[in-house]
Amino acid sequence: MLDVNVFDELRIGLATADDIRRWSKGEVKKPETINYRTLKPEKDGLFCERIFGPTRDWECACGKYKRVRYKGIICERCGVEVTKSKVRRERMGHIELAAPVTHIWYFKGVPSRLGYLLDLAPKDLDLIIYFGANIITSVDEEARHSDQTTLEAEMLLEKKDVEADAESDIAERAEKLEEDLAELEAAGAKADARRKVQAAADKEMQHIRERAQREIDRLDEVWQTFIKLAPKQMIRDEKLYDELIDRYEDYFTGGMGAESIEALIQNFDLDAEAEELRDIINNGKGQKKMRALKRLKVVAAFQRSGNDPAGMVLNAIPVIPPELRPMVQLDGGRFATSDLNDLYRRVINRNNRLKRMIELGAPEIIVNNEKRMLQESVDALFDNGRRGRPVTGPGNRPLKSLSDLLKGKQGRFRQNLLGKRVDYSGRSVIIVGPQLRLHECGLPKLMALELFKPFVMKRLVENEYAQNIKSAKRMVERQRPEVWDVLEEAISEHPVMLNRAPTLHRLGIQAFEPVLVEGKAIQLHPLACEAFNADFDGDQMAVHLPLSAEAQAEARVLMLASNNILSPASGKPLAMPRLDMVTGLYYLTLEKSSEEFGGQGAYQPADENGPEKGVYSSLAEAIMAYDRGVLGLQAPVRIRLNHLRPPAEVEAEQFPDGWNQGETWLAHTTLGRVMFNEILPWNYPYLEGIMVRKGGGSDKIMLGDVVNDLAAKYPMITVAQTMDKMKDAGFYWSTRSGVTIAMSDVLVLPNKEEMLDRYEESARQIEVKYNRGKLTGRERYDRLVELWKDATDEVGQAVEDLYPDDNPIPMIVKSGAAGNMRQIWTLAGMKGMVVNSKGDYITRPIKTSFREGLTVLEYFNNSHGSRKGLADTALRTADSGYLTRRLVDVAQDVIVRVEDCGTRQGVRVPVAAEVLDATGAVTGYTRHDLIETSVSGRVLAGDATNAAGEVVLAAGTDLTELNIDLLVEAGIKDVKVRSVLTCQTPTGVCAKCYGKSMASGQQVDIGEAVGIVAAQSIGEPGTQLTMRTFHQGGVGGDITGGLPRVQELFEARVPKNCAPIASVEGVIHLEDEGNFYTLTIVPDDGSDNVVYEKLSKRQGLASTRVAMESNAGAFIERTLTEGDRVTVGQRLLRGAADPHDVLEILGRRGVEQHLIDEVQAVYRAQGVAIHDKHIEIIIRQMLRRGTVIESGSTEFLPGSLVDLSEAKLANSEAIGAGGQPAELRSEIMGITKASLATESWLSAASFQETTRVLTDAAINKRSDKLIGLKENVIIGKLIPAGTGISRYRNISIKPTEAARNAAYSIPTYGESIYGDDGFGEFTGASVPLDEAF
């Protein structure tokens, strides 16, 4: 067996019959499997012990040798080797075929490799292989030439003989006729009778002449065919072929079936054929050249790889080990067997029958029929159903062939190699664990005991609770009391991994420290729900146990939930307070006027009646007042604080040298807000405002911004502790806020009827106008939709105004905990317009609210939209999953390989936007809208200089938030940044071009699998995207949006209703031609005009931005008209541009930007933030290859797709050797095509079209260098990413003294961060790897 860690590459090739015999331990001669009485394998059958090994360990078949001491002996009675029974998983047999057969993959695959090699059409091949026609395999030209005159003379003689025979026959018949006539005359017959006899004789003589002519024509045909006979000539006429064989078998060979194909391959000269094809390619053109190119690919593949093409025709077929196609006894004494056994039995039966027929010397037609059946049975074994009807088993179920075992989701690749089931795992329902800390999960005791069983048993023996493992096992099974104590020890500091399916991104698996809980449900921390997309309505999660010390360390350092607070897609926090917690924090930080709620302890300024009230000397005094009931939590107060840092403006004013703990300042705030600020680290500036999750405002503070800021300024451990405190406070105060929903909380508008009556009247007017023909159907529809939308808005606004602030429903919405105002409108106002199943509005709105209840008709109208929503969601989930799979596949080998590739290239991205005043003058600069997703977290590729030419930031600087602010202040509009699109690393990317990891905020580590993170970041929000195609009132047809648009872009498909783009800059001239326009661009440079014909009017001309004449700084949007100016790459019609056109006209950079903008447009429309770098990684993979136009002196074939980095290398070698470089054209490939074009055949085969990929790889003798992740998972190696790359794998750990000391000062979770220990300034949660080693 192969040692899994020893090889560096895996090659696949064509096996010849000799290889198959060499692998085999014996020939399978009988179709029998096992004896039904003894249940032992039959000798020489498909389960034979002599060939495949013993069924029992160390025991031969007859029982003469038993026990391990006879190891290696071959029993002289039964011939079975005494060894372990597991050899039955490894040993192969073979079947010697009585006639050769072709391998169906090479004959029936598209394109047919056999057909291309032999230059035969697949239809003809089919006829030859399945005994429908004969083919000439070789012709002895010399002998035919030298004997031609003799043969021709013989032929002429034969023709003369035929003519002479015919003449004599005719003469005989004429004689007989005369005799007959004489007899009739003598008998006195009438003329009529004589005429009949005459006519019959004439007819017969005519027959003789025709027969002779046919015979002569046949001889002519035989002769002409023989004269022109050439190899690979097909003869479909069976009789003609028999005639040729009878007469001239010494001069040629031929036949039908795989034997003739084998003969052709043996006579085939690869080098001569390749030479000839290259000649055609260089000198030919059109179809002939294209065919020669395709053929050369196959011929050159055999030449290069050294594969023997004879391997495509088999004389022996391998029999796979019996344990891989087992036969098991079921309860009722019946047997269940693998389909392969049935397929093998068919092959053996037919093969044996064919052997017997050949021995008996059966007629050729019977033998050929049997050979055809043998060919069909081998085809069914290799790939059932590829040709003709599939072979079926019981119940008409097609049998699973060898190909089917590899293909698809249930195939070997995806089911067993990429997706194995693992030990040490369990699953259960999840419930909320509000008492947990962020890095903990609650594990049911019974589940933990089962998972940690071996650890518990070991400790029971170590602690002398049990004498040996066996008794320890018994103790665990009986759940003795001491077992629980030992279990507590075993699980302490041993993280477990929790996973929730579907795992859409890497945060779908996180590590937690287990805490034992009663019951049978896993308890999950509420803040971890967002990342898992989990809720507690019956969701289940799986638990996995990292076993080795390295695995535990990785789980703790990389996967612990408290280290995964930020999203890898956008860098925004995922572990955010939500639902009840938000309500609680909102309630805690609300401020209400003293009259409304606050009691006598609220702040009142000094007046003539007395001094100011509600000023407290310390937080403790304020809490005392609250406890006594004289001060409300939300009442405005003044409190003197000395343990919390003041807000930035107060600090700047009162403490110019910076505030130190203990210095006092007066806070104008509420008691609740002080309590909230106590949750935050003590040196975090005081936050004065209402905490909300979404929907900002002047006095509102977004929780997300707070968490973001914390993550940027503090170590993760501090952030995690703060989040936990927020969670606790949120739950505590939401419980005390009394926010609940009752029917009485849903207030109903008193004057809704009056409002709606006004709109009803307007709707009636529209209907009247329509009935009188003053409006078209479309205008009526548009006006009614607008009218009722206005009605819904007015009613909704009235509902919002009706609700007081302390009503629980607006509290829930305003805090951002759940829902939105639209839902309140629906509950208490009116539902409004709904769509039908086509996606058009129903012109009757739903006028009732859910509180009042819908009428039957309204309920029916509403059900359309709801049903569409559910169907959409189901389709979207499947589509989104498939998109993620394709993205992962195309980007899986993009790994950060090096620190810096040293390139000076980059891409320009906008940083600052001008702020204009009313006159259009620039008054300052503000951040560009897209900074978050395009600029932040990158590295400058060139110096950023301001208008005066001074360097603000040097090349190589990281663009942090502070640095971006510097650029904006300096008024720098755009900068050149490093990007993966311009990275020069041949495989993977470099850390500088990638920038910072969004999940950590630090520069990305070497070994990070950024490709997969990119794929997950794009795929994970896929389910949120709509499936909609937007209707545009008949103009331009449907515009594809949402998920289908993203797929269309990544697959580089030509969009439906695609818009042509201008290939030159110039002025346009329009001609109207009925339903179409003809658009001409007159170029500025004076070159030839460019004409675009047949531009659809229905699609409509594109819009353009034109400066206003009245106002210099302003622009208006309008459609293109005569005389407008267009720039290169500008769209001429509405609709999406074709990426292939963009590549051709705007080049590589143009299409990169086009794809990024278009993909981001879809995600932004749904409010999803994804960093550009993720999309760039996918685009880099799509643009990696080019088509060879001229091969120069390189090895490439014209028309083939090659990796541009490989081509660059080959070109420099060619130039170095004084040759010509290859000429290439950039190509854009869809992600599916790009995945299949990968260098790794293992990765491509496990993705799609498995048989096609393997066929191609075998012919080319492809070698897989095992660079990507999938191929290493398949063969069971550590993946070459993360800690699996050699840089980390081959480390010898010797900590320095400094690192050893630092190790003891790492803060633990329990240490307080809020005390006076100065710990807040601490900046490193753990020792960096580089220092530790």
Curated annotation (Swiss-Prot):
Cellular component GO terms, alphabetical: DNA-directed RNA polymerase complex
Presence of keyword Metal-binding: yes
Substrates-to-products reaction catalysed: RNA(n) + a ribonucleoside 5'-triphosphate = RNA(n+1) + diphosphate
Listed EC numbers: 2.7.7.6
Organism per entry: Corynebacterium glutamicum (strain R)
Broadest EC class assigned to this enzyme: transferase
Domain of life according to the entry: Bacteria
Listed cofactors: Mg(2+); Zn(2+)
Gene designation: rpoC
Keyword Glycoprotein: no
Residues noted as binding Zn(2+) 1 in the record, renumbered to the chain: 60, 62, 75, 78
GO MF annotation terms: DNA binding; DNA-directed RNA polymerase activity; magnesium ion binding; zinc ion binding
The name this protein goes by in its record: DNA-directed RNA polymerase subunit beta'
Function, in words: DNA-dependent RNA polymerase catalyzes the transcription of DNA into RNA using the four ribonucleoside triphosphates as substrates.
Comment on bound cofactor: Binds 1 Mg(2+) ion per subunit.
Record-listed Mg(2+) binding positions: 535, 537, 539
Similarity section: Belongs to the RNA polymerase beta' chain family.
Residue positions binding Zn(2+) 2: 901, 983, 990, 993
GO BP terms: DNA-templated transcription
